[in-house]
Structures are given as C-alpha cells and as structure tokens.
UniProtKB/Swiss-Prot annotation:
Induction behaviour: Up-regulated by lipopolysaccharide and down-regulated by dexamethasone.
Assigned keywords, A-Z: Cell membrane, Glycoprotein, Ion channel, Ion transport, Lipoprotein, Membrane, Palmitate, Phosphoprotein, Potassium, Potassium channel, Potassium transport, Transmembrane, Transmembrane helix, Transport, Voltage-gated channel
Subcellular localization(s) per the UniProt record: Cell membrane
Any GO CC annotation of this UniProt entry: voltage-gated potassium channel complex
Membrane topology recorded in Swiss-Prot or TrEMBL: Multi-pass membrane protein
Domain notes: The N-terminus may be important in determining the rate of inactivation of the channel while the tail may play a role in modulation of channel activity and/or targeting of the channel to specific subcellular compartments.
Motif Selectivity filter: where in chain: 397-402
InterPro entries associated with the record: BTB/POZ_dom, Ion_trans_dom, K_chnl_volt-dep_Kv, K_chnl_volt-dep_Kv1, K_chnl_volt-dep_Kv1.3, SKP1/BTB/POZ_sf, T1-type_BTB, VG_K_chnl
Protein name: Potassium voltage-gated channel subfamily A member 3
Entry's family note: Belongs to the potassium channel family. A (Shaker) (TC 1.A.1.2) subfamily. Kv1.3/KCNA3 sub-subfamily.
Positions in the Cytoplasmic compartment: 1-187, 270-280, 335-350, 435-528
Amino acid sequence: MTVVPGDHLLEPEAAGGGGGDPPQGGCGSGGGGGGCDRYEPLPPALPAAGEQDCCGERVVINISGLRFETQLKTLCQFPETLLGDPKRRMRYFDPLRNEYFFDRNRPSFDAILYYYQSGGRIRRPVNVPIDIFSEEIRFYQLGEEAMEKFREDEGFLREEERPLPRRDFQRQVWLLFEYPESSGPARGIAIVSVLVILISIVIFCLETLPEFRDEKDYPASPSQDVFEAANNSTSGAPSGASSFSDPFFVVETLCIIWFSFELLVRFFACPSKATFSRNIMNLIDIVAIIPYFITLGTELAERQGNGQQAMSLAILRVIRLVRVFRIFKLSRHSKGLQILGQTLKASMRELGLLIFFLFIGVILFSSAVYFAEADDPSSGFNSIPDAFWWAVVTMTTVGYGDMHPVTIGGKIVGSLCAIAGVLTIALPVPVIVSNFNYFYHRETEGEEQAQYMHVGSCQHLSSSAEELRKARSNSTLSKSEYMVIEEGGMNHSAFPQTPFKTGNSTATCTTNNNPNSCVNIKKIFTDV
C-alpha cells in the first residue's frame, strides 16, 4: 500500500467547469471520450492521529535469529510497553531487513507475544527459569501489573511496601538504623550492632562453664538450686550482693543498654508504630532484653530480702533460656537469614503437608512395628507411643539405633518405613528450593550486575526526511512507522545526533543526550 500525502490528493474536476459527482453507470456519451480520464477515485482515508500505529499491518520480530510475525494492532493493545510504543521499538528496527531485532531469550518470547495476543495473560514457559523470565518481563516493559500476575501465578507472596517517614530528621534516623546499605554511618551502626549481639551470645555461653557458674552461684541442677537457696535464706546472705560487680553482669548490662537504645530509637523513628509493633523481628528484640530486666528486678528484690530465691532460681532458669533468641537478631543484618525466613514463610503450605504426611507415617509404622514385635519379649517396643520415637527417627533417615526391630516382620516394617520417609521428605523439596531461588535472586539482583552491550539498529535511522524516503523506496517498512517518524516521533530538533564509525563509513545516531541510546543495554543479575 502506498501512502499518498494529503496535499497531493487529486480533486475531481467537473466537465465544463462545473463540480459534481461523476456520471453514474460509466462515462456519458455527451461528455466526450475523455470524460473518464478527468476523474480518479480518492484513496482510502488515512487513520486518525491516535490510530496511525494500530493498523492491521503485519510486523516481523526477530528474536536472536528466530522470526515472529504478528499484527501491529496486536502490539498496540498495550501502548505503554516496549513493543506497543512505536517510539520505543523504533531503535530496534532494521529497515534493510524490514524487521525488529532483539538479542534476547528466544523461548521466553513465546509467552511475551502471547501476552499481547491474549490481552494480558502472562504464562511462563516450563523450560524457562523464573529469574530469566522475570528479566524478560522487565526488558519488554510489560509493567508492574504483569509482574504481579506472574508472581501470583508462580505462587509467590506479594512484596510488602516499606514506606519511609515523612520528616527529614526522622527519615535519616530510620535509614541509619534500618538500612545499613544507605550510608557509611549506617553501615558502621550495623557493624556495632552485630558485634554487640555476638558478645552477648558469647557471654551467654561462657557463663555456664563450671568455673564461672560457681562464681555466679549458677547451680548445676534443680536440686542444687533448692539446696543453695535454703542455705542462703538460712544464713541471711543475699545471693545477689555480688552480682552487680560480676564481669559477666557488667558486660551484659552494656549489651542491654545498646539493645534498648537501638529499639527505642527505631520505635520513635519508624513511619508506623502499629506496623513496627507487629513485626516479628521487633518482637524478638523485645523478648531478647526482657530477661535482663526480670533478672535485675529479682536481684534487687532478693537484695532487700523480699524475694523467694527457691522459686526465683527455677523461674530465672527458664527466663535466661529466652536470651538465646538474641541470635535471631543477626537476621536483621544478614540477607541469608532473611532469605531463609522468607523461603520458609512462602513454603508454609508445603511444610504443613510434609508434617501431615510424617504424622500419618509415624502412626502407621509405629502401630505396625508394635504388633510385629509384640511376640518377642526382648523387643523394646512396649507400646505404640514408645514406637513413635523409632518411627520419627527412621522416616527422617537419622537412625540412632537406640530402638530397633529384631523380628523378621519388624525388619520388613522398618525397611518400608525408611523408604516411605525418603519419599515423603523428597516431595516438597523442589518447591522449597524454587522459592529459595526466587527470593535469593530478588534480594541480590541489585548487588552484582554485569552489563554487556550489543549493536542496535539506530545507525540505520536518520531524522532527515530525504533519507527516510530513500529507505522507504528500498524496503517495505510499514506506513505506520514512517508516519510516526515524519510526524516528529524521531524529531531532529528533539534528539541531537552523534556520528560514529561503522567500518569505513560514518553513520548518524540519535542520542537523546545519552551515549548508550544507540545500543541495547541488558543487565544480567548474577549471584555470588
């Protein structure tokens, strides 16, 4: 189809100087034999300005050597995408071959093209990894809605928005304590916090050694708790008199001061107090410092002679155990632990099924081994509940050996139990690994990037109308694309030109103040 400019359309000329429609039924005899040559039919009306790019013409898309063909109106359903916007896709056009060339993943484009053909349905091909397909969605600029649909179809959780405080000072403080990568001081605060956590964990472990436990009056057994409590209450010597001068207590106090300061600062600087209070990591921070204040209150009460030490030591033994949860504070500064937590959270359904299958297997095989071993007096399976431990150890392939079947029937049941355990545990593993890979690439995609550039096709383009007409005569570029260029889509005044050499000749490329606009830049996110 030839595009005829509007100012060159032929107007009908009426015979004898009069205007009107040509005679119906052919040229009249009275008008002369040349009457038919004076009238030419008008060409079809050109599309409106908003419909120029959505004609029914076909377009060829070359993906790393594999050619796809579709209609322009199919691509124009999504004008905000790379293929749907003529200005965006023009830089990838090769007028010599009359096609768009993309050096991208070929299997992924089947799903990308189906997205346009189906009106917005996105489906990942089974032979394309999740991280590669998500990169293709970003490259073709399908938008956040398509990305959310893709993640939802893959079974991933929606990413939670993390707003920042509105006030400048509050935002700076929040960034310092919540985002270690935001600045150097924030990284320094994170390092100090990690060191304090490690010191607290080391102190928690060292104070249980026998030599240090004696100094701190740390009983080795519950009976010794009561015995020493009775002696102290009889003699009237307060057990907490020397606790405040103990080195472990001093170091613990310094650690708690830092934990409390960090928690309070983050609480007052957070953008939402309600969200802060519901965060599991903040709850762990609170649980990590509560045992210290309970212990301190108990020590002060005993020092004044108002406490019941026999009861307090038993309670404090449990309270001190809670201090071990401080190790989870490291997950705030470790992306690996965060990824593991997100993976477990996203895989709760699979983990629930695993526990359910294990529960069924434990009941089944513990009952079977009990009845198989019931006739042997030397068997250790005295009841079905006693066999629960053996079934769990066998299905998880641990095999402590403290309980084992001795009869032929019991050994057969044990073999089946081990095989069933291997199959049960192996079933949800691929799903959990897939979730881990997704969260790992999502967390690390901004850290390690490698860029490579390949030559685009914009050296073939020129803003000169004369060169466009020459290219039109040598290729079959669709009229829609030329209309876009001629009407200012690639205007010379809006996009300055930069010459560059290709072989022995010099080509011209529009740069839009960006030296990389003439090449297709792809970011590959790698993991370490």
